[in-house]
């Protein structure tokens, strides 16, 4: 095996917006901020968030539902 062709591994710290801190090793190293992690992601926690905010689906149906009735 050739010597010194592989990058060096450094300690990397990933901090989630929920406060969870993950320490691992990476070739990039350094600190990184995450939006979601396995501790707060809805898929892993089982808590689903409501996607319809402000009646966006109703607004869409009202706007484009009328187009369908005109063609019929």
UniProtKB/Swiss-Prot annotation:
Its cofactor is Zn(2+). Keywords: Metal-binding, Ribonucleoprotein, Ribosomal protein, RNA-binding, rRNA-binding, Zinc. InterPro entries: Ribosomal_bL28/bL31-like_sf, Ribosomal_bL31, Ribosomal_bL31_A, Ribosomal_bL31_sf. SUPFAM superfamilies: L28p-like. It holds the Pfam family Ribosomal_L31. Zn(2+) binds at residues 16, 18, 37, 40. The keyword tRNA processing does not apply. GO terms for molecular function: metal ion binding; rRNA binding; structural constituent of ribosome. One of its GO terms (biological process) is translation. Binds 1 zinc ion per subunit. GO terms for cellular component: ribonucleoprotein complex; ribosome. Belongs to the bacterial ribosomal protein bL31 family. Type A subfamily. Binds the 23S rRNA. PANTHER family: 50S RIBOSOMAL PROTEIN L31, CHLOROPLASTIC, LARGE RIBOSOMAL SUBUNIT PROTEIN BL31A. HAMAP family: Ribosomal_bL31_1. Part of the 50S ribosomal subunit. This is Large ribosomal subunit protein bL31. It comes from Alcanivorax borkumensis (strain ATCC 700651 / DSM 11573 / NCIMB 13689 / SK2). The gene is rpmE.
């Amino acid at each position: 095996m050739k010597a010194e062709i592989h990058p060096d591994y450094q300690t990397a710290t990933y901090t989630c917006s929920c406060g969870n801190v993950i320490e691992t090793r990476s070739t990039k190293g350094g600190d990184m901020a995450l939006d979601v992690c396995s501790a707060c992601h809805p898929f892993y926690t089982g808590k689903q968030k409501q996607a319809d905010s402000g009646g966006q689906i109703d607004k869409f149906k009202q706007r484009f539902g009328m187009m369908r009735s005109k063609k019929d």
